Amino acid sequence: MALEIPKIEAILRGIAILLLVSTACLVGLDSQTKFVIVYEKEVTYKDLHALVVLVYVDAVAAAYNLLQLCRCSVSALSKGNFKGSYRYLSWACFVLDQLAAYTTFAAHSAALQHSVLGITGAKVFQWMKWCNRFTRFCFQIGGALTCGYIASVLMVMISFISAFNLFRLYSPKHFLRLKGT
């Protein structure tokens, strides 16, 4: 079981990287041009500020998971005893995994909320509905958000694994005392 956990973590990180990169690419490269009344209107991800934030957050989260995947590979190849520094590394990985999972989920939720305004519009603010005119743009953003939420769920699972890796170092009988001491 202990040998399978790093493999599962590496697989989850690899899939999360692919989903985060595909989300960033789908959102970042999405644009559509249509004639609206008498002028040509192009809609891109830059028109919705939450989508701009989403592209940056997904790119940073994918880079972080790539660095963690490299760390998993290096620690699997080296069979040294890193007990003293491993505790601090486990704490850092745990906190950063939690931060990455919560940040990506928050960015995807903000982008979803902003996208719902694009679907429904807001008469109070005189915002028009976009998705009845720019259907391909909306479908592509919807697919990207689906990929992003799946990546967020995978990152939550990764943070469960990093929590397990951290708290298995501590004694179950003594509060915050390492097992070896």
Curated annotation (Swiss-Prot):
The keyword Translocase does not apply. One of its GO terms (cellular component) is plasma membrane. Keywords: Cell membrane, Membrane, Transmembrane, Transmembrane helix. Pfam families: CASP_dom (PF04535). The chain crosses the membrane at residues 8-28, 50-70, 99-119, 141-161. Homodimer and heterodimers. This is CASP-like protein 2C1. It comes from the Eukaryota. It comes from Populus trichocarpa. It is a multi-pass membrane protein. NCBIfam families: A_tha_TIGR01569. Residues 29-49, 120-140 are extracellular. It is found in: Cell membrane. InterPro entries: CASP/CASPL, CASP_dom. Residues 1-7, 71-98, 162-181 are cytoplasmic. Belongs to the Casparian strip membrane proteins (CASP) family.
